[in-house]
Amino acid sequence: MQKMVWAFIVASAVGLLIGPWLIPYLRRLKFGQSIREEGPKGHQRKAGTPTMGGLLFLIAVPMAVLVTVGFTPQSGVLLLGLLGFGLIGFLDDYIKVVKKRNLGLRAWQKFTGQLILSLILIYGVVYGIDRGTSLYLPGFEVWWDAGALYYPLALLLIVGTTNAVNLADGLDGLAAGMTFWVALAFAAIASAGTSDVTAAFAAALAGGCIGFLFFNHHPARMFMGDTGSLALGGAVATLALLTRTELILPVLGAVFVAETLSVILQVASFKLTGKRIFRMSPLHHHFELGGWPETTVVYTFWAASLISAFLGVLLAMPIRF
């Protein structure tokens, strides 16, 4: 518990300390956010806000983890999930901002990178720390050895989670605030399961979100970019693997799931019927275009994330790992 608390404090403090330096540094490099014309009109005023602020997570979280629990097989895998996906996001942001290629990495390039990194993570979790291929079935309180089926399921979970967090990063403070509650839930789950290293990492991730939110709450002074959203998604997915909560993650991150489903349903509906279900997807834009102030949407989604994270913790309590 003590390591977990210190990891949270260190990550928060580091984030708060480097934020005032990072923002002007990104401005000097002219790493400003470009806003899509087809997005909500009110977002155009955000153009030029420094992006790639997710670098804060890539500094604060590893520092907190290494200071509190050091480098172990578990912390190594968790840091790989954070830093590896953060690197993919950084390359995507760099191409968008510096190379002026609006879409960043091509879809096949991003997917290939995510696929390779996911396979490395799965191998590290299953064999490197001997996690095995068993899955906990919530509600039934039984374990099922998925065998070879575990690998595609884990692959879907990692890639899906990283992109779900990326989709949710559309309003000031939204993705970081939602991830904060999920990370805090993982800290509680890991602590109850007597995994100090995993609990410390989850607490550091939550602390990093708090440090970042100080500069990202409305009106945001910097955005995390894909650097941050993919890093957060990769970290959350890896936490699910290590805590054996793969099948509970959709509950823990239910709002992220809703954001993703809104995009899938919107695209499918438009292709099949020519009509849209939502005013705009992801879901947060639907409410925004319905007249909700941005802060109201964000606070509502934060509250929903808190509730879903709490329910996820209750489902995970029988697990001991």
UniProtKB/Swiss-Prot annotation:
| E.C. number(s) listed in UniProt | 2.7.8.13
Q: Which organism is it from?
A: Heliobacterium modesticaldum (strain ATCC 51547 / Ice1)
Kindly give the InterPro entries that the UniProt entry links to this protein: Glycosyl_transferase_4, PNAcMuramoyl-5peptid_Trfase, PNAcMuramoyl-5peptid_Trfase_CS
Q: How does it sit in the membrane?
A: Multi-pass membrane protein
Give Gene Ontology CC terms.
plasma membrane
List residues traversing the bilayer: 4-24, 51-71, 75-95, 109-129, 139-159, 173-193, 195-215, 222-242, 247-267, 297-317
Q: Which GO terms describe its biological process?
A: cell division; cell wall organization; peptidoglycan biosynthetic process; regulation of cell shape
Q: Which gene encodes it?
A: mraY
Cofactors needed by this protein, per the record, are: Mg(2+)
What UniProt keywords are attached to this protein's entry?
Cell cycle, Cell division, Cell membrane, Cell shape, Cell wall biogenesis/degradation, Magnesium, Membrane, Metal-binding, Peptidoglycan synthesis, Transferase, Transmembrane, Transmembrane helix
Question: Which reaction does this enzyme catalyse, per its entry?
Answer: UDP-N-acetyl-alpha-D-muramoyl-L-alanyl-gamma-D-glutamyl-meso-2,6-diaminopimeloyl-D-alanyl-D-alanine + di-trans,octa-cis-undecaprenyl phosphate = di-trans,octa-cis-undecaprenyl diphospho-N-acetyl-alpha-D-muramoyl-L-alanyl-D-glutamyl-meso-2,6-diaminopimeloyl-D-alanyl-D-alanine + UMP
Return one GO MF term.
Answer: phospho-N-acetylmuramoyl-pentapeptide-transferase activity
Family assignment?
Belongs to the glycosyltransferase 4 family. MraY subfamily.
Predominant location category:
membrane
Report the protein name in the record.
Answer: Phospho-N-acetylmuramoyl-pentapeptide-transferase
